[in-house]
Amino acid sequence: VMQSPLPVRDGVNATRLRLPDEGPWDTAMDYMMHRWGHIDPQGIEDRFDAGEIVGEGGVRLNRGTKLEDHTFIWYYRTLPPETRLPVEINILHQDEHILVVDKPHFLPTTPGGTYIQESALVRLRNLLNLPDLIPMHRLDRMTAGILLLSTNPDTRGRYQVLFEKRQVQKEYECVSAATPAAGYPAVEFPVVVRNRMTKSRSYLLAEVIDGEPNAETRIERVRAFDAGDPTDHTATSRRALYRLEPHTGKTHQLRVHMASLGLGIVNDAFYPDLLDKAPDDYTKPLQLLARGITFVDPITKERVEYRSQLELSEARG
């Protein structure tokens, strides 16, 4: 991996740009004006004048730097103002190698799109003054619970290997209907769902397709309970808490696997039906929680378990 010559600033990495090998642009600045001059020409000139755009080894570029002098350049993006999300991260464990936190619903794991400062990673880098912090896995923005991050670049690889080799056991909880939706067969629990999932970057939803299974989840029904209005005795008012053990880590895997049984997770705006985009409703978080994570710590060689202190808002009993 190519090392950025610019440090993390305000918890955010510098952006890397590859310059074209050739083209009608004389200088690196000409090329950047071609790409982004319609948005903020003054800002681009100011950055070159201030020496804020650098090449490999941290060499500063100026307005006259030739296009062919550099293959890669780095700079800090102008960050749009963000509204702080009304959710908090709980720190559960911190040592010289790892940080374990409870990520709240609605907060993305890593910066992207409209969420930069408002991501678990950037918030924690700034809060703890840990510019080298990197998450070892991801949770969907709408999912809450246990998130493991590496605080130490020297030992990071040893934890990464555990995730790559699937030597980390993860346990989730969700709240769904107690019985499958109309048209779906009854389910004998525990059940293992196996299928082939795919997710294209251009499309919001993950899809199940024919072929060799690449996604597997063991699902257990923990307990059923009455939901909502106690005077409403229709079957739909019965819900259940489920324990999920994913053996693979596909995007949206747990949400898709529950929906495939006719047991879509409560407050899921994507599965089984994609709802119209709406502002976040903080009173209705997706009822999916990363409850626990277990592995043999590569440093101490001891089996460790970290468990979430959060509870799903719709779980009863």
Functional labels for PLM-detected ranges:
Residues V1-G317:
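RNA pseudouridine synthases
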